[in-house]
Amino acid sequence: MRIRFSKMHGLGNDFVVIDGISQTVRLTPEKIRKLADRHFGVGCDQVLLVEIPEQPNVDFRYRIFNCDGSEVENCGNGARCFAVFVRERRLTGKRVIRVETAGGIIELRVQDDEQVSVDMGVPRLLPEKIPFVADQQAVTYPLDVAGQVCSISAVSMGNPHAVMLVDDVKSAPVGQLGPLVENHPRFPARVNAGFLQVVSRDEINLRVYERGAGETLACGTGACAAVVTGRLRGLLNDTVKVNLPGGSLRISWPGEGHSVIMTGPAVTVFHGQIKL
C-alpha cells in the first residue's frame, strides 16, 4: 500500500499528515512506528490522520498517533498543521474549520497572515476528568516521584498534563523526571509532563516531556496547560507568550469556564509517498 503524505511542523514539533478521505488508509501501530522512525521511515513526533467526521456540523475528524503507535486525544501544534493541510489539499476552502478529536470538538481559524488560532476548549480541572487520582480538586498537588515530592498542577486540554514550576528550564531535569511523571500510577492514562519557568506576568519558558513521544521542540496543549496553571496560581496575565525550544506561541485564557486560545505558525516541509 502506497500512501501520500505531507511532512509538516509547528515550531519544530513535526508531523506526517495523511489525507484519509481521498485515499484508503489502514494504519496499524506497526505502520505508524515505521512512518515515525527517523532512520527507516519518514520521521516525526506524531502521525496525523484526516478523516470524514462522525458528528454533524463538523468539517473533519482529526486523529493523532504518537511515534510509539498509541492514539492520543489532542495535539495543539498538530491542529495548526491540520488546518493548513486541509486547505492546501483543497479538502476545504474555509478559514474557520471545526474538527472532532477524541478529546472533543475544536475550532481552527486560519488568519490572513497564515498564522492559525485554535480554540482548544475549556480546560478540565476535576481530577476524574483528567484523569488523575486525588481526593479533591486543588490548584496544586504533592506527587511522590522516586522518593522526591514534587508540587504539580493537573490539567486536561483534551489530553492530560502535569505541570511543575522550575527556576530555570535549561537546567530542569526533564529527561530524568519526565518519564517518571509520565508513567506515574496516579495518572491512569499516563500524562504529559511540563516544566514551567515564569519570566514575567506576560511571558514563560516551557519544556514538555510528551506522553509516548519524549521531549519535543514544542507542545501546543502543553503550552495551554502551562498558562492555565500559571493563571490559577495567580502568576500570569490572561495573554502570555510561551517560549518553547522550537519557538513561541501566544496563549490566551480569560479564566475558569472559558476556552483557551492558542495562536502560532504551521509549516509544510515537503510532500511525498511511502510504501507501507
Curated annotation (Swiss-Prot):
Q: Which UniProt keywords are listed? A: Amino-acid biosynthesis, Cytoplasm, Isomerase, Lysine biosynthesis
Provide the site residues for: Could be important to modulate the pK values of the two catalytic cysteine residues: H161, E210
Q: Which domain of life is it from?
A: Bacteria
In Gene Ontology terms, what is a biological process of this protein? Answer: lysine biosynthetic process via diaminopimelate
Which residues of this UniProt protein bind substrate?
N13, Q46, N66, G76, N77, N159, N192, E210, R211, G220, T221
- The catalytic residues are C75 (proton donor), C219 (proton acceptor)
Identify the EC number(s): 5.1.1.7
The pathway that the record names for this protein is: Amino-acid biosynthesis; L-lysine biosynthesis via DAP pathway; DL-2,6-diaminopimelate from LL-2,6-diaminopimelate: step 1/1
Enzyme class at the top of the EC tree = isomerase
- Quote the Pfam families the UniProt record gives: DAP_epimerase
Q: Is the keyword Amino-acid biosynthesis assigned to this protein?
A: yes
Summarize the subunit comment: Homodimer.
Listed name of the protein: Diaminopimelate epimerase
Species this protein is from: Cellvibrio japonicus (strain Ueda107) (Pseudomonas fluorescens subsp. cellulosa)
* Recorded name of the encoding gene: dapF
